[in-house]
Design a protein with these regions (language model features):
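A charged, aromatic-enriched C-terminal amphipathic alpha-helix characteristic of glycosyltransferases
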Residues: 174-196
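Donor nucleotide-sugar binding/catalytic pocket of nucleotide-sugar-dependent glycosyltransferases
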Residues: 1-40
Length: 196
């Protein structure tokens, strides 16, 4: 880093006590923060939005839910073109990558819990999207640093007992969790762009 350079990070700990700015990158527009659709919680509808790659933890998640006797479904949004048939598992539905904001918001609204099974993350946009649509989020211990001061994020161990225990907790306390989530101050695209 030269003497005229300035460090920019999305997390304070990444700066390692060096001078720099903390930014909150975001693609959240006003569209994400209005016209909320009430979630129905009788049937658990899990959502994952992201690439279908090992490092994203999706295969680990599929293994965790494979033998469950709980009534639920999982929608995966992020398959590459012509690869939606790569995952064949009961109650799992795979869809291609969705880039249209309106359609993506509908996916979040049509589900009641978002799952981010990644092994590593920096500043996941999908986490902000789920929170913007007031959908509780389940993550695993490896990325618990992404929680920060945000409400509505739950940490599970990477096993089915812990995962479904968290789902049950969310299902039984959904309204209260959503009330807490309304207190979240999420970064927006406009706020991010004003910094530069």
């Amino acid at each position: 880093v030269s003497k005229i350079s300035s460090l920019i990070s999305c997390r304070k700990y990444i700066l390692k006590n060096k001078a720099g700015s903390i930014v909150a990158p975001s693609q959240i527009t006003d569209q994400w923060l209005k016209d909320y659709k009430e979630a129905r919680t009788q049937n658990i509808k899990l959502l994952y939005v992201g690439r279908i790659r090992k490092e994203k933890g999706i295969y680990s998640l599929l293994e965790i839910i494979k033998d469950s006797n709980i009534n639920f479904s999982l929608s995966i949004i992020g398959a590459e073109k012509n690869s939606t048939n790569l995952i064949v598992q009961d109650n799992v539905y795979t869809h291609e990558v969705e880039n249209n904001q309106k359609n993506l918001i509908k996916y979040y609204d049509d589900h009641n819990i978002f799952v981010l099974p990644s092994y590593t993350e920096g500043h996941p946009m999908v986490l902000l999207e789920a929170l913007a649509r007031q959908r509780p989020v389940i993550i695993f211990k490896e990325i618990e640093h992404v929680i920060g001061d945000k409400k509505g994020i739950f940490v599970a161990e990477r096993n089915s007992d812990s995962f479904f225990k968290i789902i049950k907790h969310i299902q039984e306390n959904y309204n209260g969790i959503q009330q807490e989530m309304k207190k979240n101050k999420l970064p927006t695209k406009d706020e991010f762009l004003k910094r530069f």
